[in-house]
Amino acid sequence: MPRLWIKICGMRTPEAIESAAQSGADAVGFVFHADSPRNVSAEEARALRSAVPESLERVAVFLHPSQALLDAAIDALAPHWVQADSTDLASLRLPQGQRVLPVLRSGGPRPDPLPSRCLFESGRSGAGEVADWDEARRIATGTEVVLAGGLDAHNVGDAVRAVRPFGVDVSSGVESSRGVKDVARIREFIRAARAAEPFPVREEIRR
């Protein structure tokens, strides 16, 4: 049976990173977008990088970045994954071999063919809006979907059972206030997500 991939996004403190690691997350995300309450600079990301244990993958998260911002963030964080809208990724220069996590949105366009893995969320990143689970499940029949958008400890189990995603991603759903991660909510979210496992392997993406 597959193990659900869990990403906690919007890391800004070593304490939140430690909570994610100790609670069994697989990845942590760092947001590089000035309009987000979870924004970190390249310098802040470089300092936080030392707090990320080897058990966690680092994800650099962007929304319409400049090439200069992308380059600085990658240099600082050395991310395992770069997450950005698929249209942004098409116009950016990435280091050779850099793995990407294209973002698809509810009601938005879909690339053809689908990427081997993508993040699916609502129309606005980090707004706590629930994505269209029916649309997500349809996409998940053909590729590995990381489901995001409005998830928290109360609905993630239902989301996993409804969509059968490769993984889940949470940010505002584990915060006590905008941009402030709550270590207890991180634990509760991961516990609830793991409780929804296992679910059958989809034939379409079995390796």
Which residues fall in each region the model found?
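Conserved N-terminal beta1-alpha1 strand-loop-helix module at the mouth
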Residues: 1-120, 125-207
